[in-house]
């Protein structure tokens, strides 16, 4: 579906099975009827967020300026998925915001807040709210950005969209109590206009975020707190696992970097998919 300059939505085909278009792409089309067009060209992208494994890649959104990772007090969220999203954002030089939703669940919120403390400590912005009650604290962070909401299913992304844009009518569903997980309610990425300068993309919930397209250095750079110790290891090609003279392991033992973050780095760098 392509939005034309006048705001009309036009169903469009792509040329060939390998033609990949992402939500947020700016394209040139050719009308083939009053009700359909063909995408002829995708204009150069300023940014591209995507995930990948050894066999394929999945485009998520193009030309975004900010990633908003939505986590919740309940169901519990994955530290690794959060870290992977932030690595991908750092690679594309995107502004980042972590939203902790469902803060009305007080006991669960305390646990989630502690889980996010290492991210606050290294400078990530964390916004706490309850989308069902009041999503307005998020609005100032959206101004002037093309933002994308990402996160696991059940975190409340669609509820946020509906609170910010009541006419959007994004589908929502209760989480599975037995599985402590959400079900996919958004089936494809969709772009919404907040105003002429601010736009918001909602994408399907993700359970995995492969980073096969990023090399070791890009993943290391995505752990922003490691930058202060770059080049201090005994070996220039240190992978910060078992090597003697590793500055990061020494720093972690001294309590200067969070042990959980170092462990996450080791796991992600050894298994980028």
Report residues per predicted region.
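Walker A/P-loop
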Residues: 153, 158-159, 163
């Amino acid at each position: 579906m392509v939005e034309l300059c006048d705001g009309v939505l036009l169903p469009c085909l792509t040329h060939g099975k390998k033609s990949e278009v992402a939500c947020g792409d700016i394209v040139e089309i050719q009308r083939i009827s009053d009700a359909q067009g063909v995408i002829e060209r995708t204009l150069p992208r300023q940014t591209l967020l995507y995930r990948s494994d050894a066999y394929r890649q999945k485009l998520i959104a193009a030309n975004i300026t900010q990633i908003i990772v939505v986590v919740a007090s309940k169901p519990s969220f994955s530290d690794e998925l959060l870290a992977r999203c932030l690595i991908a954002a750092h690679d594309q030089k995107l502004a980042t915001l972590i939203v902790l939703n469902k803060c009305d669940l007080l006991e669960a919120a305390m646990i989630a807040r502690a889980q996010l403390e290492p991210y606050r400590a290294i400078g990530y912005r964390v916004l706490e709210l309850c989308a069902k009650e009041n999503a307005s604290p998020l609005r100032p962070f959206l101004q002037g950005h093309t933002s994308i909401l990402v996160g696991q299913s059940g975190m409340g992304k669609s509820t946020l969209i509906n609170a910010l844009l009541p006419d959007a009518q994004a589908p929502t569903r209760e989480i599975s109590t037995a599985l402590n997980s959400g079900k996919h309610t958004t089936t494809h990425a969709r772009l919404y206009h907040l105003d002429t300068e601010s736009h918001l993309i909602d994408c399907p919930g993700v359970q995995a975020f492969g980073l096969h397209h990023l090399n070791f250095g890009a993943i290391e750079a995505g752990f922003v707190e490691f930058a202060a110790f770059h080049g201090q290891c005994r070996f220039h090609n240190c992978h910060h696992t078992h090597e003697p003279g590793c500055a990061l392991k020494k720093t972690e033992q001294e309590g200067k970097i969070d042990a959980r973050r170092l462990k996450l780095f080791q796991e992600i760098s050894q298994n980028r998919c």
